[in-house]
Amino acid sequence: SAALAGTIIDGASLGFDILNKV
């Protein structure tokens, strides 16, 4: 995401994806 808020959301989404795959 280009916006800072979007970047934070993308990071959180990636973290949740990793947790869900464990």
Swiss-Prot record:
One of its GO terms (cellular component) is membrane. Residues 11-22 are annotated as: N-terminal region. Residues 3-12 are annotated as: Plays an important role in the hemolytic activity. Its main location: secreted. It is found in: Secreted; Nematocyst; Target cell membrane. GO terms for biological process: killing of cells of another organism; monoatomic ion transport. GO terms for molecular function: toxin activity. It comes from the Eukaryota. Keywords: Cytolysis, Ion transport, Membrane, Nematocyst, Secreted, Target cell membrane, Target membrane, Toxin, Transmembrane, Transport. The keyword Transmembrane applies. Pore-forming protein that forms cations-selective hydrophilic pores of around 1 nm and causes cytolysis. Pore formation is a multi-step process that involves specific recognition of membrane sphingomyelin (but neither cholesterol nor phosphatidylcholine) using aromatic rich region and adjacent phosphocholine (POC) binding site, firm binding to the membrane (mainly driven by hydrophobic interactions) accompanied by the transfer of the N-terminal region to the lipid-water interface and finally pore formation after oligomerization of monomers. Octamer or nonamer in membranes. Monomer in the soluble state. Composed of a long N-terminal alpha-helix and a core region rich in beta-sheet structures. Before the pore formation, the alpha-helix binds the lipid membrane, partitions into the lipid-water interface and stabilizes the monomeric molecule on the membrane. Finally, it traverses the bilayer, thus forming the transmembrane pore. Hemolytic activity is 3.3 x 10(4) HU/mg. Belongs to the actinoporin family. Sea anemone subfamily. This is Magnificalysin II. It comes from Heteractis magnifica.
